[in-house]
Design a protein with these regions (language model features):
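N-terminal active-site beta-alpha-beta segment that forms phosphate/nucleotide-binding
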Residues: 2-118
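Conserved phosphate- and dinucleotide-binding cores of soluble alpha/beta proteins
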Residues: 85-165
Length: 165
């Protein structure tokens, strides 16, 4: 099996695992993930955070976003662009749309853009992960291209335990 085939199989297994969670499991897991991240020093110290709007059964960080905003942290969300580029955008009050892949995303023209080197913490959705916490994404490479430019940020993959492959 090639690496590409392995990743495709891991991706499929991870998506199936997160979709198989019951509503109760999902609610508990989302709360536990948010609490665990908020207890980390990297979250406590972060001023600028890139997170994501959950899609397709991904771990939902809404509770974390509410608490981070209450603490005065700046929250940016990814906007997928041409050439598989990613932009960190802080949405305005009416600055949301359904963007690429049907994901809720900030409207760039109504958002403040943060440079990658301005980010302190990047929370990345995982489709699957392995025993040594290597991330498998959706396969387009948006984060793979973006993360190396986040030179001062702590980068954390976010997934449910059920997504371990």
């Amino acid at each position: 099996m090639t690496i590409t085939e392995q990743k495709a199989a891991q991706r499929k297994a991870g998506i199936a695992a997160r979709r198989a969670l019951s509503d109760t499991q999902r609610t508990r897991s989302n709360a536990a993930l948010c609490a665990r991240i908020m207890a980390l020093d990297c979250f406590k110290k972060a001023e600028n955070i890139l997170l994501y709007a959950a899609f397709g059964g991904e771990a939902d960080l809404s509770a974390l976003a509410v608490e981070a905003a209450r603490q005065g942290k700046t929250l940016a969300y990814p906007v997928c662009g041409e050439g598989f580029s990613l932009t960190a955008a802080v949405p305005g009050p009416d600055g949301w749309e359904v963007g690429a892949y049907g994901i809720r995303t900030p409207i760039l023209s109504r958002s403040e853009v943060l440079r990658p080197d301005q980010l302190d913490l990047v929370l990345v959705p995982c489709t699957a992960f392995d025993a040594v916490c290597r991330r498998v994404g959706m396969g387009k490479g948006y984060y793979d291209r973006y993360l190396p430019r986040c030179t001062r940020a702590v980068k954390l993959g976010v997934a449910f335990e059920a997504q371990r492959v």
